[in-house]
Amino acid sequence: MSLVPEHGNVYVLNQTNQLKGLFTIIRDKTKPRSEFIFYANRIIRLIVEEGLNHLPVSSAKVTTAQNAEYEGVMFDGRICGVSIMRAGESMEQGLRECCRSVRIGKILIQRDEETHKPVLHYIKLPEDISKRYVLLLDPMLATGGSAICAMEILINMGCKQEQIIFLNVIASPEGLKNVHDRFPNIRIVTAVIDEGLDNNGYIVPGLGDFGDIYFGTKA
């Protein structure tokens, strides 16, 4: 995991051969959907695990089966996930595999294909979300419009920037800059930063529409 100074609170997974191999598979348009899902889930799990590393902890002692004391840590506070629908829902299982019985809220924000502006359609969040650490889920960070819209909603509901950790699979430099300029204290954990955006606002080299491929609605 490395911090990206030029983008503020941005943390990128170590670019190991394993991670590069996983991305080679999910970026390959000739691969079947089943392989995309399997290997995308592996990347998502890595991102979630790293996101959890950014939660506050306090020291804790337990007694082992050998009647020996072990000094460890326990997480402070409660968490919840918030997926930016629909693609963000692909990351929910990875979060549930790491955090049993975690509460997950949903925000539906769709991008206008002509203006590329985000439009809010649906929201359902835990009533006590302002008292929780929020893992915001969306696999692709392109322009950052949808992410910023979701973050504004969370802030308006009483969440502090420091409580929000944004998890995504692929980010663009433009999206990272836009999010950081608007919310400099929100941490972002991503698996990789791609080259940039094309004229249509899509990430390149990217992998296409993550949600369409994952949920089987690719044309």
From Swiss-Prot:
- What are the disulfide bonds? none
Glycosyltransferase listed as a keyword: yes
- InterPro entries linked: PRibTrfase_dom, PRTase-like
EC supergroup of this enzyme: transferase
- Which segments of the protein form a coiled coil according to its record? none
Q: A Pfam family matched by this chain, by name?
A: UPRTase
Put simply, this protein is called Uracil phosphoribosyltransferase 1
Report the source organism. Schizosaccharomyces pombe (strain 972 / ATCC 24843) (Fission yeast)
The record's Gene3D superfamilies line, in alphabetical order, gives: 3.40.50.2020
